[in-house]
Amino acid sequence: MDLAYLPSPSTGVLHLGPIPLRAYAFCIILGVFAAVWLGNRRWVARGGKQGVIADVTLWAVPFGLVGGRLYHVFTSPDAYFGERGEPVRALYVWEGGLGIWGAIALGAVGAWIGCRRHRIPLPAFADAVAPGIVLAQAIGRWGNWFNQELYGRPTTLPWGLEIDRAHRPAGTLDIATYHPTFLYESLWNIGVAALILWAAKRFPLGHGRTFALYVAAYTVGRFGTEYLRIDEAHTFLGLRLNNWTSVLVFLGAVACLVVSAHRHPGIENVARLQGAGADGRTDDPRPADASVGLASGPPGNSTPRRATESWNVRNRS
């Protein structure tokens, strides 16, 4: 008998009065709101306009949901198109199954459309929302807890997650507790968000480098949690497909960090970028100050004015 363990919820449905709501969907919605809130604070702290982050998010989220679902279905086709699969269930997003890589890839397309409409560069937007995205992932992982899915190998550790017999793998029906990989990844993602906010205050992480830092840091943790998972997945050379994806994406993110730092040192002046066009670029060579991190509110008029005066001096010289 296990003396200590983490229990699983008895149901995956929350009731808001008479309205039933899938807990998985609720976690996603809550994560989106958190991402918009934090992204807006960072954008405004750098001189950006209120509402821009929310407007662009209205484009990014639908694209991201479609991309995340497509990635999940394409990488786990047997569950929907196999011998016992039900193709129509590929549309049941509320039951769980969103691949982060597909969500980021197609979500970026939606964000690009939104950024074009507001005439701002996509990298500047991505840098602003990077810690919010990983915070949203931390919240969204709790949807897996409600669904009793994507857990890890059996374990006898005190924090092992108890899984109902109906949700256990066929080969381990008599084993009750498993690694709570949802919790591991959620805690890791909170740490990544904190790392980004800290780094943004101390280094000039502009031109997409903040977003690249998020991707690189996230993939390290994802590789570890993916290694513990036991749900069915395609493998290559002994590693799950998502492990290989993590390795490739990590290398790409590190390359982006290095190349961007060499070609575009400094950070964009968001106040001047708005309205200058999606291809406009104005750099501030100084490291980002505290206002680029988790600022307490909108900036005063002094920050944009100092940046403009500095730009004028450089042009007169």
From Swiss-Prot:
It is a multi-pass membrane protein. It is an enzyme of class 2 (transferase). It comes from the Bacteria. Residues 275-317 are annotated as: Disordered. A 1,2-diacyl-sn-glycero-3-phospho-(1'-sn-glycerol) binds at R141. InterPro entries: Lgt. One of its GO terms (molecular function) is phosphatidylglycerol-prolipoprotein diacylglyceryl transferase activity. Keywords: Cell membrane, Membrane, Transferase, Transmembrane, Transmembrane helix. The keyword Acyltransferase does not apply. It is found in: Cell membrane. Pathway: Protein modification; lipoprotein biosynthesis (diacylglyceryl transfer). One of its GO terms (cellular component) is plasma membrane. The keyword DNA damage does not apply. GO terms for biological process: lipoprotein biosynthetic process. Catalyzes the transfer of the diacylglyceryl group from phosphatidylglycerol to the sulfhydryl group of the N-terminal cysteine of a prolipoprotein, the first step in the formation of mature lipoproteins. NCBIfam families: lgt. This is Phosphatidylglycerol--prolipoprotein diacylglyceryl transferase 2. It comes from Streptomyces coelicolor (strain ATCC BAA-471 / A3(2) / M145). The lineage of its organism: Bacteria, Bacillati, Actinomycetota, Actinomycetes, Kitasatosporales. The gene is lgt2.
